[in-house]
């Protein structure tokens, strides 16, 4: 089972990840894009990143917004290093449109 991050670990990570929050025991962020097409482009690329890590987000799309929620199912739905790595990868591709 992956190691669950402590509250202190999570607060440190949130200081590094712009716009992310700790909500309901998960890392969460809503991205806003210029159009539905840009939002879908991000989701497709994000899906490839998730597959590469074999770690998948909970997410939703409404027009130009994508809300991402990251927690590790194997760790009882808590935040682990896998979630942090995926959030960092999403940040690197979030400019994509």
Curated annotation (Swiss-Prot):
GO terms for biological process: tetrahydrobiopterin biosynthetic process. It comes from Opitutus terrae (strain DSM 11246 / JCM 15787 / PB90-1). InterPro entries: PCD_sf, Pterin_deHydtase. It holds the Pfam family Pterin_4a. Its EC number is 4.2.1.96. Keywords: Lyase. Belongs to the pterin-4-alpha-carbinolamine dehydratase family. This is Putative pterin-4-alpha-carbinolamine dehydratase.
């Amino acid at each position: 089972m992956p190691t669950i991050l402590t509250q202190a670990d999570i607060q440190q990570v949130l200081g590094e990840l712009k716009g992310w929050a700790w909500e309901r025991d998960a890392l969460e962020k809503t991205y806003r894009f210029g159009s539905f097409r840009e939002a879908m482009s991000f989701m497709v690329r994000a899906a490839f990143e998730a597959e590469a890590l074999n770690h998948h987000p909970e997410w939703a799309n409404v027009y130009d917004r994508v809300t991402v929620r990251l927690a590790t199912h194997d760790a009882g739905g808590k935040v682990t290093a896998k979630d942090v790595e995926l959030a960092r990868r999403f940040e690197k591709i979030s400019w994509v449109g």
